[in-house]
Amino acid sequence: MAEFQWPWEYTFPPFFTLQPHEETRQQQLKVWTDLFLKYLRHTNRFTLSIGDQNSPLFHNEALKRRLSPELVLAILGELERSGHANPLDKRRQEWQVYWFTLEEYGNMVYDWVQETGQTNTICTLYEIASGENTSHLDFYGVDEAVLLSALRLLEEKGRCELIEMDGSHGVKFF
């Protein structure tokens, strides 16, 4: 895997401190949310823990600067508002982060189903997330928990039905 390319802001010490001026803070949060999504996609991760203070995402060792838990929460809050994250616990310490929104994932999967003529067939989540027929698509490699959440949205719209089989999930598309 190629080395992650950090944006120039990552080497700018004030970037690691929540800015007091509203416009500056909004721009800072925009850059951080983009950085979170790009970094997590690059590292193929879908979960974050606020307590993981040694992660390069939270800590620039060369600058000896680290994000405060408050700033991490502010960034994750922005990601939540844009549909790219949800807390996994009530204390909001563990988060699931989506490279695309759940609706975007659902639409990508449904488009693939339509294009490949798989309506009225049953697919496993593994086939969708990791199968050789999807290896060229943006949702390839998606965490199955994220995929399941996206498929639940499709199910609410009447586009599919989730089926549980021996503790694993399948899905029938309409």
Curated annotation (Swiss-Prot):
Inactivation phenotype: Vps25 mutant cells exhibit multivesicular body sorting defects, with large amounts of ubiquitinated proteins detected on endosomes. This leads to activation of signals (through Notch and Dpp receptors) that drive cell proliferation, non-autonomous overgrowth, loss of epithelial organization, and render cells sensitive to apoptosis. Vps25 mutant cells display accumulation of autophagosomes. Bicoid mRNA is mislocalized in developing eggs.
UniProt keyword terms in alphabetical order: Cytoplasm, Endosome, Membrane, Protein transport, Transport
UniProt subcellular location: Cytoplasm; Endosome membrane
GO molecular function: protein homodimerization activity; structural molecule activity
Record flagged with keyword Mitochondrion: no
Gene Ontology biological process: autophagosome maturation; bicoid mRNA localization; endosomal transport; endosome transport via multivesicular body sorting pathway; epithelial structure maintenance; imaginal disc-derived male genitalia morphogenesis; maintenance of epithelial cell apical/basal polarity; negative regulation of epithelial cell proliferation
UniProt-listed Gene3D superfamilies: Winged helix' DNA-binding domain. Chain C. Domain 1 (1.10.10.570), Winged helix-like DNA-binding domain superfamily/Winged helix DNA-binding domain (1.10.10.10)
InterPro entries xref list: ESCRT-II_cplx_Vps25-sub (IPR008570), ESCRT-II_cplx_Vps25-sub_N (IPR014041), WH-like_DNA-bd_sf (IPR036388), WH_DNA-bd_sf (IPR036390)
A Pfam entry, by short name: ESCRT-II
The keyword Protein transport is assigned to this record: yes
Matches recorded under SUPFAM superfamilies: Winged helix' DNA-binding domain (SSF46785)
One GO location term (cellular component): ESCRT II complex
Family per similarity comment: Belongs to the VPS25 family.
Role: Component of the ESCRT-II complex (endosomal sorting complex required for transport II), which is required for multivesicular body (MVB) formation and sorting of endosomal cargo proteins into MVBs. The MVB pathway mediates delivery of transmembrane proteins into the lumen of the lysosome for degradation. The ESCRT-II complex is probably involved in the recruitment of the ESCRT-III complex. Seems to function as a tumor suppressor by regulating Notch trafficking, hence preventing non-autonomous overproliferation. May be involved in the regulation of autophagy.
UniProt subunit comment: Component of the endosomal sorting complex required for transport II (ESCRT-II). Interacts with Lsn/Snf8/Vps22.
Protein name according to UniProt: Vacuolar protein-sorting-associated protein 25
Organism: Drosophila melanogaster
